[in-house]
Amino acid sequence: MFISSAYAQNTETSLEHIKNVAERIDRVFPPFDFVHFGSHLFWLAISFGLFYLFISRVIVPRIGGVIETRRDRIASDLDQAMRMKQEADIVVETYERKLAQARSQAHVIAQTASEEIKQKVELERKEIEANLEKKLTDAEKQIAKIRDKAMKSVGSIAEEVALEIVKKLIDVEVSKESVRSAVKATGY
């Protein structure tokens, strides 16, 4: 086997180290040595005292400040949320009130328009009925005139026809006065 000089030197150091350890093997580890126990307690008390002082003077106030800031922020956020809720309630109430007003106005407008339309329709119906009544009355008058005129003509026509019939059937000439009186007796 090939042994380097560095490895050989390391072996010698290890032997010296073993000799030193053998000399100290009777000794106790200093932190566990009861001879030094009082000084350990002293430094422990000083360390914990300084640690307690540092925590109570620096860390706890900072944590308290953070907690207080957070509590203030939460309270502020709750106040702001309450204000915003009240504003939203006011806006909703205003909206509902305006919506109700708009609905009532729309109802009034629809009612008014309906009544106006009914009045216009009724007025037009009355005008048309009056116009038709007038035309009907005029037509009845004209019919009466035409009937009267026709009735007058019927009498003279009946007289002429009666004269012609008597002349042709009986071959006798009758006076117009006797035919007229006979036609008038029948109602023409």
Curated annotation (Swiss-Prot):
Belongs to the ATPase B chain family. Its main location: membrane. It comes from the Bacteria. F-type ATPases have 2 components, F(1) - the catalytic core - and F(0) - the membrane proton channel. F(1) has five subunits: alpha(3), beta(3), gamma(1), delta(1), epsilon(1). F(0) has three main subunits: a(1), b(2) and c(10-14). The alpha and beta chains form an alternating ring which encloses part of the gamma chain. F(1) is attached to F(0) by a central stalk formed by the gamma and epsilon chains, while a peripheral stalk is formed by the delta and b chains. The keyword Membrane applies. Keywords: ATP synthesis, Cell inner membrane, Cell membrane, CF(0), Hydrogen ion transport, Ion transport, Membrane, Transmembrane, Transmembrane helix, Transport. F(1)F(0) ATP synthase produces ATP from ADP in the presence of a proton or sodium gradient. F-type ATPases consist of two structural domains, F(1) containing the extramembraneous catalytic core and F(0) containing the membrane proton channel, linked together by a central stalk and a peripheral stalk. During catalysis, ATP synthesis in the catalytic domain of F(1) is coupled via a rotary mechanism of the central stalk subunits to proton translocation. The chain crosses the membrane at residues 35-55. GO terms for cellular component: plasma membrane; proton-transporting ATP synthase complex. It is a single-pass membrane protein. Pfam families: ATP-synt_B. It comes from Bartonella henselae (strain ATCC 49882 / DSM 28221 / CCUG 30454 / Houston 1) (Rochalimaea henselae). One of its GO terms (molecular function) is proton-transporting ATP synthase activity, rotational mechanism. Coiled coil: none annotated. It is found in: Cell inner membrane. This is ATP synthase subunit b 1.
